[in-house]
Amino acid sequence: MADPSAFYEPEEDELLSQLAIPVQNYQPLSEGDEYRRLQQLEQHAYAQQTAMAQEQEMEQLAVLELIPEDVKRFLVMFHQAILENDLPTITSMYESGWNKLTQAHYLNNEWPEAELIAPLVGNDQVFLTLYRELYFRHVYARLQPTIDDRFQSYENICELFNYLLNSEGPVPLDLPIQWLWDMLDEFVYQFTSFSHWRSSPKAKTEEELEMLAESPNIWSSYSVLNVLYSLVQKSQINEQLKAERAGKSVEEVTEVAGEYGSKPLYKNLGYFSLICLLHVHVLLGDPTLALQTMENVDLGNAAFLTRITACHVTTYYHVGCAYMALGRWPDAIKTFVSVLIFFIRMKQYHTRSYQYGSIAKTCERMYALLAICTTLSPGPSDENIMTIVKEHYGDQLAILQRGGPEALEAFKDLYLQACPKYLNVNPPPYEDASALEAWLANPPADATQRHLELFLSDVQAVQGVNGMRNLLKLYTSIDAAKLAAFSVSGEEEGEEEVLQQLMVLKSASSTYGRGQAETTLLDGERKVTNNLDFTIDGTMVHVEETTSHRRYAGFFIRNAEHAQRALTSIKSAPLPVRKPASSSAPAPATTAAPISKSGESAAPAPAEAPAAPEKKAGTWVPKSRQARIAA
């Protein structure tokens, strides 16, 4: 006889036990009766499951009817384009179609959940995972995410990256670079948002505290860094960039890239992961490691990252912040000025972009940081950019340059306004109630406040010698005793203090900066960051200003060469040929010569020369052209 246990799974025991009806005075049944009884219970259970599934399907169809028709058509076409790897259509629907439908239907509410639209796309799990990524990005951008949204977005993005990284081979998926950048940038943004939200236990409900205690690894810095480094390693992007910089052929670079890195999807994900690693390491307070991750990335005007304006601006902002954390003010100034010039030139092309608002905010923060850097390291800079800085932060800039306690407060306000929102590496210990109480009793200092204290200590060291620098500007040489009389009271003790301040000024006036031939972002040499230099010979201080004036020679040389080329082109151009008179035109009537009194015909009077064309005022004709016209 067949084994009854072979017709149902062990996990159905609980369901069958719930469906079983207790019978009074239960008598043992024979094997046949027991088998028939189990069959009836099994059929009843499956019938109940089928009814529940049909009921859920009916509810799903009813909800699906509430979705606008244009949204359903968009999702079906979007799914079809992704299946066919139709990159132009995917790009258009992602950058334009999605945002238009959001503005029309879901400006202040959520898009339909992935389970509701699953019948429209044949329950394609890859597409549904990509759809959830857009869904949660919309929730973070437009709405207030709940703790369930935060957890589910993390699980969804991990599912997507596991699919990309752990498949047996490269996945047959092709997405536009704008989507890939937005995906990784949103990944880092949601990580920072969750970290800031998690760092305040007092505002949490009991349910939220319990969920955080059960899931300590959700959005942990280790898991985020693990994903980014895995994408970098899978794509072999560092090896590819090194090969391209060495001038190797396309075939050699493809061989270096390997099976995964040769695919555009993995190569672009690896490239953008390097920039996201820069972002994360800056937020975690490790500027040196942040710049090391970018050692193979080109930051020139023709770099790959310049194809996406948001990526370009984000990269330069965090590189500049890393330089500021290392005290390399000239490098930070060059970085900020470079990307701000680019943004001004490209601004007209991005005013209608859906990312224009965030890009403009980042640029505004860079103007504030530029005001700080140019105060701490005065020197020549782009005049147009500095004009904008003075327009936006003119009052603060005057206070910064004047010095004093007000300047320190202005430095603090500008820094907090424009600096990155740094993260605490270790979250509160939610899994241990006693440790959490101790943490609440003595919470650690905020990461941004710690960076602010370090920054202000550097500012105070520089601001303390600003008065000495202003005095030195008035002299070419001055005795230390005389300088002490102007700066401090008590000539004997003041002279010693003056020498100490001069040494501090000398130290504060130099930093480590990149040279012309440097290749990586960390390479550099010692540079003077001040436009004032001095030497001490005994008790005499010899001062020399090193202000570099604007060079006009190159401007005149370029324009002279341009004028010479224009003149040569004019000389070599052929003269215009006047068209001959048409044969069909009537011949001019000839007037008979007048008869003189002697009967001889008089010679015809000479025709008047045609009047010279009137020269237009303000026109200039080269002399060589005039000579040829006269000839």
Curated annotation (Swiss-Prot):
GO terms for molecular function: translation initiation factor activity. Keywords: Cytoplasm, Initiation factor, Protein biosynthesis. One of its GO terms (cellular component) is eukaryotic 48S preinitiation complex. GO terms for biological process: formation of cytoplasmic translation initiation complex; translational initiation. Residues 580-612 have a biased composition (Low complexity). Its main location: cytoplasm. It is found in: Cytoplasm. Residues 335-526 form the PCI domain. The keyword Protein biosynthesis applies. InterPro entries: eIF3l (IPR019382), PCI_dom (IPR000717). Residues 571-631 are annotated as: Disordered. It holds the Pfam family Paf67. Component of the eukaryotic translation initiation factor 3 (eIF-3) complex. Belongs to the eIF-3 subunit L family. Component of the eukaryotic translation initiation factor 3 (eIF-3) complex, which is involved in protein synthesis of a specialized repertoire of mRNAs and, together with other initiation factors, stimulates binding of mRNA and methionyl-tRNAi to the 40S ribosome. The eIF-3 complex specifically targets and initiates translation of a subset of mRNAs involved in cell proliferation. This is Eukaryotic translation initiation factor 3 subunit L. It comes from Cryptococcus neoformans var. neoformans serotype D (strain JEC21 / ATCC MYA-565) (Filobasidiella neoformans). The lineage of its organism: Eukaryota, Fungi, Dikarya, Basidiomycota, Agaricomycotina.
